[in-house]
């Protein structure tokens, strides 16, 4: 009879569902458990839901088939009983239906129908269970997503420091940085004031400027922002105006911070400029000046108001109140009318008469013999002379307010 195998198949499908559920919830015997991803859990949940729906449809079809078979047998039983009561035509022995057999078949059909009802009920229970499991999975997914966002927010909330950038000109996304000041510090001195004592790379955000990366040098005098460093000739400093405006180089090696960034740090405030020089014999010199840097509308003019520390000859700086604009080979703003100092020498600088200093000149790993080459080098006239190419230089800046704060 076809009803029994169909019901058996449905029971086997139900058993397979139970096995899948027990396998999902049972303990893992492996010593190194592998946790399923959320996508795999979704696939499993949807698969189980489809299996439950298939079992339900199978049970409904089986019950419908059994009902139709029961009706046919009932009709056959009535016809057979009517034929048995008639004596007009003799019936063949094989065409006679024993009432006991009919009763037995009907009993079996009722029992089968009862089992189908039970199976249908179990399938409905399994489907409700799967729906609950699916809701639990969705809830866990939402909780997992919330925890993931909280983890990301926690990572964002950490002060991001000492991150590398391939070029000094690249800005930093402010959404990825939150400082202990509830904002990024304006400069390295502000970092020093909130307790930072370790030198390194930090992200700052001067007022009205996007965030950017700077080298901070922490000393007993406070925090200094490094704006230039030369020591090995790895970076070409003979660049056009836009490069000097934006900045270039490697923050871990040689670099120029950028005129616009330096101006955003100093703003309208007077600042201290420190210049560190080193020759090829290991001798070092430190010079400090009180300076004010103008904006691009002044060609980033540098005004040296007065010496703050170190020895500086009177002939090496312009008179008090005189500003020296910044020049490059493609934008000549120097004080020489008959010469483009940046083109004649090398690199961009605050050229006055082309002869007192140029810390962005060509780097020489050994001192050349030709005087024409020597004049293109890195020099500071009042310390080692006009034609002595220096081995290393560093320029640092700090707001003048630091003097009162320290």
From Swiss-Prot:
The lineage of its organism: Eukaryota, Metazoa, Chordata, Craniata, Vertebrata. Changing residue 40 to K: Associated with lower plasma levels of triglyceride and higher levels of HDL cholesterol; strongly reduced inactivation of lipoprotein lipase LPL; no effect on protein secretion and stability of monomers; abolishes accumulation of oligomers. Pfam families: Fibrinogen_C. PROSITE patterns: FIBRINOGEN_C_1, FIBRINOGEN_C_2. It is found in: Secreted; Secreted, Extracellular space, Extracellular matrix. The keyword Glycoprotein applies. GO terms for molecular function: enzyme inhibitor activity; identical protein binding; lipase binding; lipase inhibitor activity. One of its GO terms (biological process) is negative regulation of endothelial cell apoptotic process. Residues 179-401 form the Fibrinogen C-terminal domain. Residues 1-25 form the signal peptide. CDD domains: FReD. One of its GO terms (cellular component) is blood microparticle. Mediates inactivation of the lipoprotein lipase LPL, and thereby plays a role in the regulation of triglyceride clearance from the blood serum and in lipid metabolism. May also play a role in regulating glucose homeostasis and insulin sensitivity. Inhibits proliferation, migration, and tubule formation of endothelial cells and reduces vascular leakage. N-glycosylated. This is Angiopoietin-related protein 4. The gene is ANGPTL4. Keywords: Angiogenesis, Coiled coil, Disulfide bond, Extracellular matrix, Glycoprotein, Lipid metabolism, Secreted, Signal. The record marks 164-165 as: Cleavage. Residues 100-143 form a coiled coil. Detected in blood plasma (at protein level). Detected in liver. Detected in white fat tissue and placenta. Expressed at high levels in the placenta, heart, liver, muscle, pancreas and lung but expressed poorly in the brain and kidney. Homooligomer; disulfide-linked via Cys residues in the N-terminal part of the protein. The homooligomer undergoes proteolytic processing to release the ANGPTL4 C-terminal chain, which circulates as a monomer. The homooligomer unprocessed form is able to interact with the extracellular matrix. Changing residue 40 to D: Decreased inactivation of lipoprotein lipase LPL. Induction: Up-regulated when cells are exposed to severe hypoxia (in vitro). Disulfide bonds join 188-216, 341-354. Glycans are attached at residue 177.
């Amino acid at each position: 009879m076809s009803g029994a195998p169909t019901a058996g198949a449905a029971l086997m499908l139900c058993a397979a569902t139970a096995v899948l559920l027990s396998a999902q919830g049972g303990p893992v015997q492996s010593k190194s458990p592998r946790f399923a991803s959320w996508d795999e859990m979704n696939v499993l949940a949807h698969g189980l839901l489809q299996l439950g729906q298939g079992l339900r449809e199978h049970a409904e079809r089986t019950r419908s088939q059994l009902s139709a078979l029961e009706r046919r047998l009932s009709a056959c039983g009535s016809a057979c009983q009517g034929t048995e009561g008639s004596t007009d035509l003799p019936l063949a022995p094989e065409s006679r239906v024993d009432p006991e057999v009919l009763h037995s078949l009907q009993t079996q059909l009722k029992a089968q129908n009862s089992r189908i009802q039970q199976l249908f009920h179990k399938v409905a229970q399994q489907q409700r269970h799967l729906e609950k499991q699916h809701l639990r999975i969705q809830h866990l997914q939402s909780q997992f997503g919330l925890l993931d966002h909280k983890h990301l927010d926690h990572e964002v909330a950490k002060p991001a420091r000492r991150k590398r950038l391939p070029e000094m000109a690249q800005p930093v996304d402010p959404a990825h940085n939150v400082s202990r000041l509830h904002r990024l510090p304006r400069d390295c001195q502000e970092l020093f004031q909130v307790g930072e004592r370790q030198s390194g790379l930090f992200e700052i955000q001067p007022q009205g400027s996007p965030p950017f990366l700077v080298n901070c040098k922490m000393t007993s005098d406070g925090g200094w922002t490094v704006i230039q460093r030369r020591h090995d000739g790895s970076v070409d400093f003979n660049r056009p105006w836009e490069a000097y405006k934006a900045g270039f180089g490697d923050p871990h090696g040689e670099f120029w911070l950028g005129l616009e960034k330096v101006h955003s740090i100093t703003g309208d405030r007077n600042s201290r400029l420190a210049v560190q020089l080193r020759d090829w014999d290991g001798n070092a010199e430190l010079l400090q000046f009180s300076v004010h840097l103008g904006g691009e509308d002044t060609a980033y003019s540098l005004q040296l108001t007065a010496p703050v520390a170190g020895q500086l000859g009177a002939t090496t700086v312009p008179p008090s109140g005189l500003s020296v604009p910044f020049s490059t080979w493609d934008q000549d703003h120097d004080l020489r009318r008959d010469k483009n100092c940046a083109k004649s020498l090398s690199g961009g600088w605050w050229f006055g008469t082309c002869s007192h200093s140029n810390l962005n000149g060509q780097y020489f790993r050994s001192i050349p013999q030709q005087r024409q080459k020597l004049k293109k080098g890195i020099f500071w006239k009042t310390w080692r002379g006009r034609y002595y190419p220096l081995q290393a230089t560093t320029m640092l800046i700090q707001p003048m307010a630091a003097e009162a704060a320290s």
